[in-house]
UniProtKB/Swiss-Prot annotation:
Keywords for the protein's UniProt record, in alphabetical order: Aminoacyl-tRNA synthetase, ATP-binding, Cytoplasm, Ligase, Nucleotide-binding, Protein biosynthesis
Record-given protein name: Serine--tRNA ligase
CDD domains for this protein: SerRS_core
Domain-related comment: Consists of two distinct domains, a catalytic core and a N-terminal extension that is involved in tRNA binding.
Organism per entry: Metamycoplasma arthritidis (strain 158L3-1)
PROSITE patterns xref list: AA_TRNA_LIGASE_II
Pfam family, one: tRNA-synt_2b
Alphabetized GO MF terms: ATP binding; serine-tRNA ligase activity
Self-association state and partner proteins as the record states: Homodimer. The tRNA molecule binds across the dimer.
Subcellular localization: Cytoplasm
SUPFAM superfamilies tied to this protein: Class II aaRS and biotin synthetases, tRNA-binding arm
Function: Catalyzes the attachment of serine to tRNA(Ser). Is also able to aminoacylate tRNA(Sec) with serine, to form the misacylated tRNA L-seryl-tRNA(Sec), which will be further converted into selenocysteinyl-tRNA(Sec).
Residue sites binding ATP per the record: 261-263, 348-351
Name of the encoding gene: serS
Amino acid sequence: MLDLKFILNNKNEVIKKLSTRNYDLANITKINNLGEMRSKLIFELEKLQAKRNKLSDEIGIKKRNNENCDSLIEEVNAIKAQIEKVDHEADDIISQVNDILTKIPNLPYDDVPVGSDELDNKVIKEHASLGRGLVKGVEAHYDIATKLDIIDFTRAVKLAQTRFVLYKNAGAKLIRALANFMLDTHINNGYKEIMPAHLVNSKMLFGTGQLPKFKDDLFRVSDSDLWLIPTAEVPLTNYHYDEILNLNEPIKYVAYTKCFRSEAGSGGRDTRGIIRQHEFHKVELVKIVRQEDAMGEWEKMVNDAKNILTLLELPYREILLCTGDMGFSSAKTIDLEIWIPSEQRYRETSSISICKDFQARRAKIRYKDADGKTKYAFTMNGSGVAIDRVMAAILENYQNSDGTITVPKVLVPYMNGITKIEAK
């Protein structure tokens, strides 16, 4: 959430940056107007309170002198009613302002490319020579997985509905291997592992920015205030909800969880395979840092995510997202897109975002600087990485002409020594 004072004092800058984020700028004008109205009400409130206090003093004097003060008491009661009315109007304005504030996206850094959608994103670097390079002419992951009997799509639909899958045999083992490999790698790089619950309350989803704006993208437990997590970013960041932290060293967390998304608005995209599911597996990275340390720590996080794909020897590219394609809470995002041979294109497998103090304001995560001043922390998060999409990439990039799948070298120890997945 943006700071209201910053918006009011830097209206032109805010409008300029939000104009690049497909945001309705009329709301900024509305906030300014509401701010002016509230200032007038507060001025009126202060005058009424001063008048009430003066009359109350006069009543006290008259009572001590045994003089009649009925008319003054009536006047004070009338002023109290006015104060209550003005107070209510001011509270209503605050409610309107907060409602707008909660739905304003983060302001992008100055070096983020301006654009309206993914077509305006900027390719930073391509790592096309990793592994076997940009493979062509292979079976789609969903076809080869069915032949190898490692994913069951049909029974998953029977058990639930479309966009769910059942991993089995070597497929289940590969999912576990990927998760454990990623966790071990990140833990060795200084992240602390947390295993959170898959359910959180609405206050936590507000903290990281999913609510109220993206309610339709979430799964909610009926008749309760519990929601399935769309990403472990939610519990990891809100782990320090409403706390003042010691940030002499960055706080670094990693978690492997299931994630749940309704995929509202995805329509008929990616209806086959494991690219887009309602329930999927992901290793998530979160850092909470001092403001001055943020950019350096974010760049390290980008490298931590890249390291996973490099070790797996899977071709990928780095994309700097434009202003119109970034997530709601992000001030700058780099996507890592992995090569999917059957589609002959790259697909996102990680987004690494720095959020400035946007989430920390919502979640009230603070720290004390060297001078003892309390400040909002800076937060960042990134997929480290999305496991199902990596599995799809392995099934295609490591596919052999005899219909088997070579297990990436770094995963062999996690696969009990299995070097090849083949039909049983």
